């Protein structure tokens, strides 16, 4: 296998470019937010084709969603009124938490063996007590392995006595020809939907025993978010397909507890693997939020998934 890792500065951002030259797969990661800004493959004519929305474009659009694959944590989506109480300590923050706004440290890059990877890190020195009051670090690794791009979160609770509570996930948006053109194939199994009018949980849920196939929701619901718990999904592979452009992404969400589907009506779909849920209209203390993840003192917590970009026929 032949891999390469290069660095470049573009539009004020420090970028890492990791390429699998044999299989024709390339990712670009910005150290600002450790955000994937590009996932590309070489097509049959030798051209690099991007799979993310606005793939590789660092400009700010005049309107609409401006990101590519936001890293979310130490909470997901929103806090009610931008604040929460964690063991009585006030936490404040904007959408999706503070990880997206930090400059991450590249602590390891590997281009040897059968896969290549980039490992980024945030430590307690990188955030304030108002952002998160406990000493918890996170490593985020992106790996190219054969045709897939793997994502691995690894949290470590450095507190000797306190249990840590947090939520995290990734917010990748996959580009389409238009909002009308894409399809999402969902696997069979038991789902639980959480309703979130106004972006916060209402307390209403609904179970769905799905036979598998085309997403059983109207696209008109996507701007309000479709939040699903993967209760019992034997083969949790989700397929995003845009027939007009021939782009197809298979997401393997084995071990992922929740997924959020969202679009603002633009030519993309976000399929967000989540370890946790958004806040509730009737807000609970941070440590008692629904879906919160728990890390005992001195222990670790990890979560992973993979994305496989492919080219589909237009049949």
List each model region and its residues.
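Active-site/ligand-binding surface loops and adjacent short beta/alpha elements
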Residues: 2, 161-165, 173-253
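Extended, loop-rich substrate-binding clefts of extracytoplasmic carbohydrate-active enzymes
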Residues: 1-10, 87-146
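Beta-strand-rich interaction surfaces with strong enrichment in secreted/lumenal proteins
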Residues: 139-141, 290-295
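Beta-strand-rich N-terminal accessory domains
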Residues: 1-69, 73-83, 90-93, 234-257, ...
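Acidic, contiguous internal or C-terminal segments within carbohydrate-active enzymes
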Residues: 18, 30, 122-166, 170-172
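Acidic/His-leaning functional-site neighborhoods
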Residues: 91, 96-109, 211-290
